[in-house]
Curated annotation (Swiss-Prot):
It is found in: Cytoplasm. Keywords: Amino-acid biosynthesis, Cytoplasm, Histidine biosynthesis, Lyase. One of its GO terms (cellular component) is cytoplasm. This is Imidazole glycerol phosphate synthase subunit HisF. It is an enzyme of class 4 (lyase). GO terms for molecular function: imidazoleglycerol-phosphate synthase activity; lyase activity. IGPS catalyzes the conversion of PRFAR and glutamine to IGP, AICAR and glutamate. The HisF subunit catalyzes the cyclization activity that produces IGP and AICAR from PRFAR using the ammonia provided by the HisH subunit. It comes from Teredinibacter turnerae (strain ATCC 39867 / T7901).
Length: 257
């Protein structure tokens, strides 16, 4: 029996507020993180992802306090990312109520960190986040590079090769964001989503670019994703999680209703 595909609302948190930008800039306020998380919990989201989008860039600790408040109100898996640099950071997040942590910049700086973290805490709670940007010209075979620090720093690392390496190091899940599509509402970058989904044996979460419910379906059917993550379509009331699940089910995708 195929595993149900997951719908994951994403809370990008900046200075204690949920925000949403376009291609990592042009930020718009979307509310209080605890209230927003409660709303998605009540709507039947499968999981929630909380990304402190300023943490890595400004090199400060993720707001443990907010995570504790969300975890007290939300009874679905919670992934927390942003500024996770040490084993203590992971331990603190898990103790605050996170089920998984998402590691991005720190993995690139020290890939062994992922291996050690997976050995210590278990692969099931280590998510490696990849912010990928297409670097091949139109008409050429797809090639994507990973960027770190909230999409600010190019690395020269091939996104597909990196995803494979990170799963070999023990990542239990890949959270893949297309920087080209982030906030654009043009749909996922299905090329990189499929390339990584086919290359790794762990679940891939597609992120970046959802503008309508068909995009969620495409992420699963054309992109091969195991889960689809979206922010603005849910934050600003265009669609609810139940509407998204009903639409996916109508298109032959198994979801938890």
């Amino acid at each position: 029996m195929p595993l149900a595909k997951r719908i994951i609302p994403c809370l990008d948190v900046d200075k204690g507020r949920v925000v949403k930008g376009v291609q990592f800039v042009d930020i718009r306020d979307a509310g209080d993180p605890v209230e927003v998380a409660k709303k998605y919990n009540e709507q039947g989201a499968d999981e929630i992802t909380f990304l402190d989008i300023t943490a890595s860039h400004e090199a400060r600790e993720t707001t443990i306090n907010t995570v504790e408040k969300i975890a007290a109100e939300v009874f679905i898996p919670l992934t927390v990312g942003g500024g996770i640099r040490t084993l203590d950071d992971i331990r603190n997040m898990l103790n605050a109520g996170a089920d998984k942590v998402s590691i991005n910049s720190a993995a690139v700086k020290d890939p062994d960190f992922v291996r050690i973290a997976a050995e210590k805490f278990g692969s099931q709670c280590i998510v490696v986040a990849i912010d990928a940007k297409r670097v091949s010209a139109d008409g050429e075979p797809g090639r994507w590079e990973i960027f770190t620090h909230g999409g600010r720093n190019p690395t020269g690392i091939d996104a597909v090769e990196w995803a494979v390496r990170m799963t070999e190091y023990g990542a239990g899940e890949i959270l893949l964001t297309s920087m080209d599509r982030d906030g654009t509402k043009d749909g996922f970058d299905l090329g990189v989503t499929r390339a990584i989904s086919e290359a790794v044996r762990v679940p891939v979460i597609a992120s970046g670019g959802v503008g309508n419910l068909q995009h969620l379906v495409d992420g699963v059917i054309k992109g091969g994703a195991d889960a689809v993550l979206a922010a603005s379509i849910f934050h600003f009331g265009e669609y609810t999680v139940p509407e998204a699940k009903a639409y996916m089910e109508q298109h032959g995708i198994e979801v938890r209703l």
